[in-house]
């Protein structure tokens, strides 16, 4: 009985120690990352297209470093200073389905893909990888996110910044 109690107490403690607080690493904003997946049946490549900032984060705020589902692609975000994984997610893309088609043996194509990630407070390293049906990585790209980079486009609207005036005043009508 004593061993069971100690084991349960130790388990609860280890879960609490490993729990990650969303606000420690992320702003309440969304980072939209646009990639282009290109290639054919034998070779695939990933290119970073654009980074955008959106006003709110509507995704999960718990179990951020855990992979929720298995897919044929994966995105991992790590804190640059510590190397700690702070966010992971998986996906399946139309490009990876197309690669298995007969057409992919004859021509190369590119597919646009957009992913929504929590907006990091500090510099982060993002790795995106595409996997085959055996979960072997076919292509990957690692790039840095600098949160205050002027090349991250501001998108969406923050309703608190919008000023709504009376229509009659704008037209000069009394």
In which residue ranges do the predicted regions lie?
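Extended acidic/polar, glycine-enriched regions
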Residues: 107-161
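N-terminal prosegments of processed precursors
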Residues: 20-113
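Intrinsically disordered, low-complexity segments enriched in Ser/Pro/Gly/Ala and basic residues
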Residues: 10-13, 72, 173
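Bacterial Sec-dependent N-terminal signal peptides
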Residues: 1-22
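Single conserved hydrophobic/aromatic residue that forms the stacking wall/gate
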Residues: 162-174
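Residues embedded in well-ordered secondary-structure elements
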Residues: 8, 64-66, 104, 117, ...
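Residue-level signal for short segments within beta-strands and strand-turn junctions
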Residues: 77-79, 130-132, 166
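Residues that cap or initiate secondary-structure elements
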Residues: 39, 81, 121-123, 132-134, ...
